[in-house]
Amino acid sequence: MSQTTRRVQRVRHEIHLRDVEVVGIAQPSANFIAVTFAGDALADFVSASFDDHLKFIFSTPAGEVLRRDYTPRRFDRQQRTLTLEFALHENGPASDWARQAAAGQRATLAGPRGSMIIPMDYDWHLLAGDAAALPAIHRRLEELPAAARAIVVVQTADASDRREFNSAAQPDVRWVATPDELIAAVRGLALPDGEGFAWCAGEASTMARLREVLVTEHAQPKEAMRVAAYWRHGTSNFHEELNP
């Protein structure tokens, strides 16, 4: 496959600071807390793509104001509610905030500043990454139609993160435990015929390796893939596009 006839659309959004209030807290797995925010400031909120990221702005107990990137997991325009899923890293300030979050607590959101809208009518969709990619993968699978063909490869060593995906697309799901197993699983895929889109997100060095596998071994067209580093070992608040 050397080309694609489908077109990814990039759109920009006007950025607003939105003051919101915590109205719900859930823990879908041992390593994630889902926090639902509400507020009139969400009336004109827009998230056009499953892998959008917004800035979550919060204060630490010491009074330091921090910003972290999060995927808009679920948005209800009628109720004006927005849910974010926080990964519970051992010493992360955003994780610490989520652990102590309570109804009525205030926070500020900004963005998304733009969306990369990937058509849903590709012949197949590959979604691959580590646990950090799970909120985006869950959202994409919920949005794909029943006719879509989805292949999912996720790296997480914790079985509690291996939640069932709610999707009309009935995806082919493969769970692995280590970065090397993630690379090997994607390398070993027999990708379907037709035009497909490969979306991958996770730790920076692993995603660089995964991108190389897609380009050199699967001959995936560069215009039909998106690879993002959601985090990097030893670096806080990291996000980088790794597209070829």
PLM region descriptions:
Residues 1-244:
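Extended, composition-driven regions rather than compact fold-specific motifs
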